[in-house]
Structure formats: structure tokens, C-alpha cells
């Protein structure tokens, strides 16, 4: 099934403005701070009053049923107002609402009372993760969940907690921010929060975290040896590229021109050549034979 785009209009906005006092968020029924990056539709109308329309996504909820989810239209308005809001949208004039929107408000622990292991400082042996720690988002919750679970298990075995540093992983940045700075709104992990973001890449996560995983037993000896072998092969390939030079010949020039790539003025070692954004290992294999797996090349 396909997804579709649609937009709010002035009638939608007027219905919302006329009923703001009935909204849980604007009527004073809820006092908590909502997530910054997914505001309700009434929040959008108030905060971005200069916008003539807001984009919405119509998403199928199932391959087997005719239910659709209206993404970007979250609200805490009463049901009768929701009916008017939905029917004001072009294309949904005759839509039937099967599940009405609603707002939730929940309590959260002050993350300053949580240890870097995600154990509570006040209640020993209580490990928490996710929204209750003041975060928002699936990945944020999952990241805390695996750390909390690992550390709860380690504590049962009287072993030292797993504490990831800010230079180790985004999880390390997230937890460090929470337990040292606290938060006054639902916390989201952003790349801009990580000062080591250039080395916290998806393609080196296995090598970054392999020793931790091995020490706490979350990977097998066989998996660990495979990672060590991969690391050794990467070092071997890097050294080879640094020690071998591409000399500019007529044949080399022809290959560069055929690929619409500027020909180097002088010979370069392959490692330095790879620093050019248009050069890949696949292109370099026009000149040398690399007998390494794709995993190592990546």
C-alpha cells in the first residue's frame, strides 16, 4: 500500500483556534512539557501561526484492513472537535474515525538521581530505562534498556558495571548527558550532542565495542576472534594502501577520464588517493587486486 501527502487548511486552523480552551495542553489539564520534535497539531497552529498549512502523512496501518494513520495530526482535543478537524481536510471529508487521538502525561525520574549504570541512587538495585528516565524516542529507550539490563545482570554477579564513555558510543553520550546535566524536557539523542560524532559511525560500531562485549559475555569467543581478525585485516589493508603508489601513465589517465574523475598531477599512494571524495576502493581495484572481503573494505 502507498502513503499519501495531504495538508491542513485555513478551515482546519480556525476550528483548532476556536477550540484551544478544550485542548488538554492549552486548557490547563496537562502541565508537563511535551516532546520538542513531534508537537501536536494545535501546538503547530499556535507556535507557527504564520504558516498557511501543515503537511500530514496518510499511512496505511495494515495490509489487510482499511485503517489509516494520520501522521502529524496528534491532538488532545475532544472527540467532537476531532471529527470537525479531520473532516476539514481535503480528501477526508467523509472519513470515519475508528480510534480517537488522546494526550498522555506521565511522571519521570529526575535523571540526576540515576547512576551512569542506570541504577537509582536512592533505591538500590532499581535499574530504569526509557521515558521514565526523561527521554523520548525508540532508539533512546532501547539503548538505555540494553545498558540497564546488562548492568542489572552484572550486579547480580557482583561484577563491575558497564559504563560507556562519550567517545565509545551515542549511548554513552545520552547517559552522560542525563546523569550529569539532567533534563527539563523529553531528551532526544542528536548527532550534534556528540563531540566524537565523526568516529561514532555505524560502520565501526563492532570494532569500537568489541572488547566491552567480550568482557561482559554478550558475544561468543568465536565472534570475538572474527572481529579481531577483521581488525587485523583492516590494518593490513591500510598499510598496503599507504605503502603502494599509483603512478600516472597513459592507461591510468584513460581510466580516470572514462570515469569522469580528475587525473592527479603526480603519483599518490592509494591511501591518500582515497581521501578524494570521488575515489572508492572499487575504483582503485582498476589498478590493484585486493583480495579482501567486502566487510573489510567497507
Question: Where does each model-flagged region fall?
Answer:
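Internal hydrophobic alpha-helix adjacent to the cofactor/substrate pocket in enzyme cavities
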Residues: 141-162
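A glycine-rich phosphate-binding loop feature that marks nucleotide/adenosyl-phosphate handling sites
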Residues: 32-39, 100-109, 161-178, 192-194, ...
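A glycine-rich dinucleotide-binding beta-alpha-beta segment and adjacent secondary-structure elements
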Residues: 57, 69-135, 163-176, 295-298
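Extended, charge-enriched "interface" segments that sit outside catalytic cores
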Residues: 193, 210-298
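Terminal amphipathic helices with adjacent charged low-complexity linkers/tails
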Residues: 40-56, 65, 77, 228-232, ...
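Rossmann-like dinucleotide-binding core of oxidoreductases
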Residues: 1-63
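Mobile "lid/hinge" segments at catalytic clefts and subdomain interfaces of large enzymes
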Residues: 175, 183, 187-215, 220-222
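Glycine-rich phosphate/pyrophosphate-binding beta-alpha loops
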Residues: 131-139, 195-197
Amino acid at each position: 500500500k502507498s502513503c499519501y501527502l495531504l495538508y491542513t487548511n485555513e478551515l482546519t486552523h480556525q476550528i483548532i483556534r476556536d477550540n484551544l480552551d478544550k485542548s488538554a495542553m492549552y486548557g490547563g489539564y496537562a502541565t508537563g512539557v511535551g516532546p520538542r520534535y513531534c508537537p501536536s497539531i494545535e501546538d503547530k497552529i499556535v507556535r507557527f501561526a504564520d504558516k498557511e498549512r501543515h503537511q500530514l502523512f496518510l499511512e496505511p496501518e495494515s495490509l489487510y484492513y482499511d485503517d489509516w494513520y494520520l501522521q502529524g495530526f496528534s491532538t488532545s482535543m475532544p472527540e467532537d472537535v476531532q471529527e470537525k478537524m479531520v473532516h476539514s481536510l481535503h480528501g477526508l471529508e467523509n472519513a470515519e474515525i475508528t480510534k480517537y487521538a488522546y494526550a498522555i502525561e506521565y511522571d519521570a525520574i529526575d535523571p540526576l538521581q540515576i547512576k551512569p549504570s542506570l541504577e537509582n541512587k536512592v533505591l538500590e538495585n532499581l535499574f530504569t530505562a526509557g521515558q521514565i528516565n526523561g527521554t523520548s524516542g525508540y532508539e533512546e529507550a532501547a539503548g538505555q534498556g540494553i545498558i540497564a539490563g546488562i548492568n542489572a545482570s552484572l550486579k547480580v554477579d557482583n561484577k563491575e558495571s558497564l559504563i560507556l564513555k562519550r567517545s565509545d558510543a551515542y549511548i554513552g553520550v545520552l547517559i552522560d548527558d542525563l546523569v550529569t546535566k539532567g533534563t527539563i524536557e523529553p531528551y532526544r539523542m542528536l548527532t550534534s550532542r556528540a563531540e566524537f560524532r565523526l568516529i561514532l559511525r555505524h560502520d565501526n560500531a563492532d570494532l569500537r565495542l568489541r572488547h566491552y562485549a567480550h568482557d561482559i559475555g554478550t558475544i561468543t569467543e568465536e565472534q570475538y576472534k572474527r572481529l579481531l581478525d577483521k581488525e587485523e585485516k583492516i590494518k593490513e589493508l591500510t598499510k598496503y594502501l599507504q605503502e603502494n603508489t599509483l603512478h600516472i601513465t597513459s592507461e591510468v589517465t584513460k581510466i580516470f577520464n572514462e570515469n569522469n574523475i580528475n587525473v592527479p598531477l603526480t603519483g599518490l599512494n592509494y591511501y591518500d588517493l582515497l581521501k578524494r571524495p570521488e575515489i572508492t576502493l572499487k575504483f582503485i581495484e582498476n589498478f590493484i587486486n585486493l583480495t579482501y572481503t567486502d566487510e573489510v573494505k567497507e
